[in-house]
A protein has these predicted regions:
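Conserved short loop/turn motifs at secondary-structure junctions
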Residues: 73-79, 83, 99-103, 226, ...
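A charged, amphipathic alpha-helical module
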Residues: 156-254
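Hydrophobic beta-strand scaffold residues
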Residues: 29, 71, 122-123
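N-terminal beta-strand-loop-alpha-helix module at the start
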Residues: 1-68, 451, 471, 478, ...
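Residue-level signal for inorganic ion chemistry
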Residues: 23, 94, 139, 231, ...
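Beta-rich, aromatic/charged-enriched effector core domains that present basic-aromatic interfaces
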Residues: 78-192, 374, 528-532
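N-terminal Rossmann-like or analogous alpha/beta NTP/dinucleotide-binding catalytic cores
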Residues: 39-93, 103-107, 134
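C-terminal catalytic domain of photolyase/cryptochrome flavoproteins
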Residues: 211-545
Length: 545
């Protein structure tokens, strides 16, 4: 009987899992997860996300046991562990999904391909829906994404038969993996829990989601982000569940359903950008921004991290992140305001912000987190009319995002007695710091800096020479300063797998296709109105001035 190893990575489910379904049809299955120290101790890995991972693995094992199988756990470098498991189990080969989240993972997978080929062993890679190998213009990718989301879900195998002689390790605790719990509440990590969250959203939040998404106090997000990060539920299953629910003729629900599906597409679109350009994990899209360097003040950085900037909505986001890992409580708008403050108003390298976020976010996903950070810093879409994303963190932000002060008062109890109209610029008091910067002056400096930098390439029809290449040194940002498992970066590196775009070999058609992923090239600077917008209404918010 055929024997196939199914290597689980960020696809911790039994439903809509093509490698598992195919392996189960062939015969015996060895479902394996490898605890990889280089990922567990990556500079951006935090204990809360590892704790969620452990919960997801326990749930996956339970689901496999319901099918007659079990999850085999191993520890070590997959490049060594998996070929040895092939030999021990007498498997014919390995099935696995490709994964483009991390440069390290693509280096590891390339090395694994080499090791298996040298040993005469086989591996078959499956691209998950929404991750495409070819370079497409973004509109074509968008069409293909919707097509793939409508394709039939891979069925759950009726049985997963595991060879009885293949033995795994027991599920370790957090401390055994070298992490200590930091007090964040960890949500249930099973597929059933993810399905319940989605159903709760569709029944109780969909009539409000689109209109209240920008208000952190409303808490209308789905709560699915950590489950999607680890593939506890597939994006395709989410999309099809939303479509199957229907809107009952309610235009508000219809708009919210469309918005949520768009958010799922955006998230996978960030992953596709990283598939093309993995250097976005380490660098800004345009080389000039990193080559000129960034200011760094450790005291100001600490004030931003801990929520002591003197801007209440920024400080509330800071404290919420550290207390909750962002789960359900820290929505996109809050994250954007918090991020823009560091990179634009404080003038610090956006990568320090991404590093801090990833260490705390339970749902931290590198392409989503890093690309959004670069966008907020103004170093990605800087040839477009939306090239600046500088938020006013004062009363304007409170009026538009937290008009009743619910979010701020929850996380800043020292300001709980103030009316909402004072929460943007609270009166001085000994229990809360004064603002650490002048918003108007900081904004003026940042706009002038970005305008000067982007003039280097704004009027050229050929942006390719200005894009940052994949660096020779692949050491993760923060590794040299804050430690982590980075020894892998010192070894000779094969071409990544899946392969990245070779910027030196793109023809004009390819260059035009790549350009569409980073918005259209324009030369007209954005117009700004000095008229103050009214306080928040029931409509979805746009970017702040």
């Amino acid at each position: 009987m055929h024997r196939t190893i199914v290597w689980f990575r960020r696809d911790l489910r039994v439903f809509d899992h093509p490698p598992l379904a195919r392996a189960a049809r062939r015969g015996l299955v060895i479902p394996v997860f490898v605890f990889d120290r280089a990922l567990l101790h990556h500079p951006e890995t935090g204990p809360a996300r590892v704790e969620f991972l452990l919960g997801a693995l326990a749930a996956l094992d339970a689901d496999l046991r319901q099918l007659g199988g079990r999850l085999i756990l191993r520890s070590g470098d997959p490049v060594q562990v998996l070929p040895e498991l092939v030999r021990q189990s007498q498997a014919e080969g390995i099935y696995a999904h490709t994964d483009c989240e991390r440069i390290y993972g693509r280096v590891r997978d390339a090395r694994l391909n080499q090791a298996l080929a040298t040993a005469g062993m086989k591996i078959r890679w499956f691209d998950p829906p929404g991750s495409l190998p070819e370079l497409l213009p973004y509109p074509a990718y968008r069409r293909r994404w919707y097509e793939q989301m409508g394709e039939a879900l891979a069925p759950c195998p009726p049985q997963v038969a595991v060879p009885p002689e293949v033995i795994g390790e027991p599920l370790p605790g957090l401390a055994q993996l070298g992490h200590q719990a930091d007090g964040k509440p960890i949500p249930a990590a099973s597929t059933a829990a993810a399905q319940a969250l989605l159903q709760d959203f569709l029944e109780d939040k969909a009539d409000r989601y689109y209109w209240q998404l920008s208000y952190p106090g409303a808490e209308v997000t789905t709560g699915l982000s950590p489950h999607l990060k680890f593939g506890v539920m597939s994006v395709r299953q989410c999309v099809q569940t939303i479509r199957a629910q229907g809107d009952g003729g309610d235009p508000r629900r219809r708009r919210s359903h469309q918005q949520l599906i768009s958010r799922l597409r955006w998230g996978q679109g960030f992953g596709q950008r990283f598939r093309y350009l993995p250097q976005l994990e380490l660098r800004s899209l345009y080389r000039i921004f990193d080559e000129e360097g960034w200011a760094f003040d450790p005291d100001l950085y600490q004030a931003w991290q801990t929520g002591h900037t003197g801007f209440p909505i920024v400080d509330a986001a800071a404290r919420c992140l550290q207390a909750t890992g962002g789960y359900l409580a820290l929505n996109f708008r809050s994250r954007a305001i918090y991020a823009s403050f560091l990179s634009n108003l404080m003038g610090m390298d956006w990568r320090y912000g991404a590093l801090h976020f990833m260490r705390h976010l339970i749902d931290g996903d590198c392409p989503i987190d890093h690309y959004q950070w670069a966008m907020q810093a103004g170093v990605t879409h800087c040839v477009d009319k939306t090239w600046t994303r500088i938020y006013n963190p004062g009363q304007a932000a409170v009026d538009r995002c937290d008009p009743e002060g619910q979010f701020i008062k929850r996380w800043l109890p020292e300001l709980a007695d103030l009316p909402p109209q004072q929460l943007g610029n609270p009166p001085r008091r000994p229990t809360y710091p004064a603002p650490i910067l002048d918003y108007k002056a900081a904004r003026k400096r940042r706009v002038a800096q970005l305008e000067r930098q982007r003039q280097r390439f704004l009027h050229t029809p050929h942006l390719l020479p200005h894009l940052a290449p994949l660096p020779a040194d692949l050491t993760p940002f923060g590794g040299d300063r804050d430690g982590g498992e980075i020894r892998w970066a010192a070894a000779p590196t094969p071409p990544l797998f899946p392969p990245a775009l070779d910027l030196t070999s793109l023809d004009r058609t390819d260059q035009a296709a790549l350009r569409t992923w980073f918005v259209a090239h324009v030369t007209i600077p954005p117009s700004r109105s000095s008229r103050r917008r009214p306080a928040s209404t029931g409509e979805q918010l746009s970017l702040l001035d």
